[in-house]
């Protein structure tokens, strides 16, 4: 009888252990992929301090790709972002802000699905497909922000920049340069807006989520742009990868 009881208790204990081991799976098995996406975004917004690193690469229609711009940074007090880019650049690449990027991914999402072959007991991996119209709107805003940064820049070796550094120099040349610079900016702005008006966007993201904490582990966003430039069809791509780390 005692042998039977011990054997039965062993089976019960084993079953309980298995249930506990699978509890993490059951925890997110009851939630849809879109719910998991939403929970990971809201979860990150509630984290007071974390670190991140990654890179952004831009590809042309010819198949050539720019050297990825690497970055790393920290977030404190939920939304105070500090970023360092490779080479000591002081500009944060557009879209790098981790929480804003995740919010955009959620906002654009038309479909989210679990990727079984990439998921395991520790993480759930989602593939998120963006709605083309929403993606075009989000990316138009991102690209306009990038263009606005360019508008505020003056080449370092220009007469205007030299005069800014040396108050004794004549202002005539800087004034002429500034006029030419503004004309070029105006022309570029019109071309840029014409490009945006024809732009279509396809974007997919891969998000790895900690199954226990429901926090993002990594994100990869792949986006393809098709548009017209000077009346000719053009295509570009952009890939941004971010890994999250709690200190």
Task: Please annotate each region the language model reported.
Residues 2-59:
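N-terminal leader/targeting segments and the immediate start of mature chains
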Residues 11, 29-30, 94, 170, ...:
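Intrinsic-disorder-associated interaction segments
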Residues 42-50, 119-121, 198, 211-217:
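Edge/loop elements at the starts and ends of beta-strands within beta-rich repeat scaffolds
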Residues 52-54, 124-128, 215-223:
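A short hydrophobic beta-strand element
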Residues 54-140:
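An acidic-aromatic
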Residues 82-87, 155-165, 237-240:
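Short C-terminal domain-edge/linker segments immediately following a structured domain
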Residues 129-199:
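Mixed-charge, low-complexity intrinsically disordered segments
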Residues 189-247:
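Acidic, serine/threonine-rich low-complexity disordered tracts
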